[in-house]
């Protein structure tokens, strides 16, 4: 964990969050500024800055986050209707927190526009 990382502080419980899932490898909570009716952030507990830093995570840790996404989608009622799972990587993608995280978004019809 990083002492200066917002998500590390949330995982440690120093900053409150609306937790929806937690296991040994990942932590998930509702986004404070949701872009869709269902918007959950899925964060590995081990601090890595982003997708370009995956060597800092084990395959099991990364797989746990992806398995969590499917479980959370079902729990949130969007597993069947559909959801989007994405990760912003770097400044041009608007990565705002330098801790790898996945946005699980759903709860409405989305467009195919990604950029």
Task: Please tell me what each predicted stretch does.
Residues 1-115:
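HIT superfamily nucleotide-processing domains
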């Amino acid at each position: 964990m990083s002492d200066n990382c917002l998500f590390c502080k949330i995982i440690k419980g120093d900053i409150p969050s609306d937790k929806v899932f937690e296991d040994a490898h990942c932590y998930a909570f509702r986004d404070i500024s949701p872009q869709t009716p269902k918007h959950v952030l899925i964060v590995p507990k081990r601090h890595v800055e982003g997708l370009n830093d995956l060597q800092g995570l084990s395959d099991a840790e990364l797989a746990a986050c992806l398995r969590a996404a499917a479980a959370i989608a079902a729990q949130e009622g969007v597993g069947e209707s559909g959801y989007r799972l994405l990760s912003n990587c770097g400044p041009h993608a608007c990565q705002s927190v330098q801790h790898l995280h996945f946005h699980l978004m759903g709860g409405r019809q989305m467009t195919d526009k990604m950029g």
